[in-house]
Amino acid sequence: MYYRMNVAGLERDLPICPVNDKLYIAGFVIFGDQELTVACARELLARAPEYDYIITAEAKGIPLAHEMARQAGDAKYILARKGPKLYMRDIFSVTVNSITTAKEQKLYLDGADAALMKGKKILVVDDVISTGESLKALEALVEKAGGEICGRMAILAEGDAQDRPDLIYLEKLPLFNPDGSIME
């Protein structure tokens, strides 16, 4: 089963995947889709508030944040990692629960990136916002670092995220029943 959608002027067929026995989601993956990544970054930047740095979470937000930073001429964007790396110093972390991840995860931020965010306007970016848990974790990292969240952006808003007045997104992504019909 697939869900056909148009985003940033491009049509894509998204596979419908089970989360559990009663809930299915459309799998939206920008990895490897340069045309879609470039188009979505352009559309989001046209709607973005003024910011100093973009932050995203590993992994699916990386190509989007990279392309947004490239198109905007930003020298750097900030990445919250799923695990600490040997080269990271003064690390701090927050816990996250996501609809696309089976178990609890942590996000880690390097102290050098945290120092860059202090007192700066930070734009939080991800590919899809659904439950908002990943977004909350990114916000907690920004706040812990002393940054000011100036906006929240995603390519797609799924489920309840579609009703968030604080979220800027390109398209709505419905949730699905096991038979592939859209949940009401």
Go through each PLM region and give its residues:
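Short glycine-rich phosphate-binding loop at a beta-alpha junction
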Residues: 51-58
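Active-site-facing substrate-recognition patch
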Residues: 1-51
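Short, hinge-like loop/turn segments at secondary-structure boundaries
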Residues: 72, 94-99, 168-171
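Short Gly/Thr/Asp-enriched flexible loops that form oxyanion-binding sites at enzyme active sites
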Residues: 64-72, 139
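Gly/Ser/Thr-rich loops at beta-strand to alpha-helix junctions
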Residues: 58-64, 131
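PRPP-dependent phosphoribosyltransferase catalytic core
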Residues: 2-4, 136-184
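Short, glycine/charge-rich flexible loops or terminal/linker lids adjacent to PRPP-binding catalytic cores
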Residues: 77-122
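A short helix->loop->beta-strand "cap" motif at the edges of active sites that frequently abuts
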Residues: 73-75, 146-147
